[in-house]
Swiss-Prot record:
Keywords: Ribonucleoprotein, Ribosomal protein, RNA-binding, rRNA-binding. It comes from Sulfurisphaera tokodaii (strain DSM 16993 / JCM 10545 / NBRC 100140 / 7). Belongs to the universal ribosomal protein uL14 family. The keyword Ribonucleoprotein applies. HAMAP family: Ribosomal_uL14. Pfam families: Ribosomal_L14 (PF00238). PROSITE patterns: RIBOSOMAL_L14. This is Large ribosomal subunit protein uL14. InterPro entries: Ribosomal_uL14, Ribosomal_uL14_arc, Ribosomal_uL14_CS, Ribosomal_uL14_sf. GO terms for cellular component: cytosolic large ribosomal subunit. One of its GO terms (biological process) is translation.
Length: 138
């Protein structure tokens, strides 16, 4: 049985970067090109409030564009880039050019073998297996 994935820590004061039904780019070479966020793991919100996710959060995505093997399927994914600016503990603000995810297996290992583009330092610290195939960490 795979070990339990770390889902969410403290969410106080976080910028709501991505929400339900946000279209995201898939940054790895798993065959998927574009996906839609359909669920956010570990989110405990208020009734009728739209759930949101941030960098390094685990989400459920539905692949909309890609190879026929992965299209119309659901996968777990880790958010590695978001366009909404967010603040780091040292006071710097950072924002990326696009919203991007990396598809992972149920045990947390990436499905692809390389990641196109940079990934956030927060995602690299929380998901070391994802960071091992990243080309650039910002």
């Amino acid at each position: 049985m795979p070990e339990k994935l770390q889902v969410l820590g403290s969410r106080k004061g976080l910028t709501p970067g991505l929400q339900h039904y946000t279209t995201v780019t898939v940054a790895d070479n798993s065959g998927a090109k574009e996906a839609v966020i359909i669920g956010i793991y570990g989110y405990k919100g208020v009734l009728r409030r739209i759930p949101f996710a941030n960098i390094a959060d685990l989400v459920m995505v539905s692949v909309r564009k890609g190879t026929p093997e992965v299209r119309k399927q659901k996968f777990k994914a880790v958010i590695v880039r978001q366009r909404m600016p967010f603040r780091r503990p040292d006071g710097t603000w950072i924002a990326f050019e696009d919203n991007a995810v990396v598809i992972v297996n149920p045990d947390g290992t990436p499905k692809g073998t390389e990641i196109r583009g940079p990934i956030a330092k927060e995602a690299a610290e929380r998901w070391p297996k994802v960071a091992s195939i990243a080309t650039m960490v910002i």
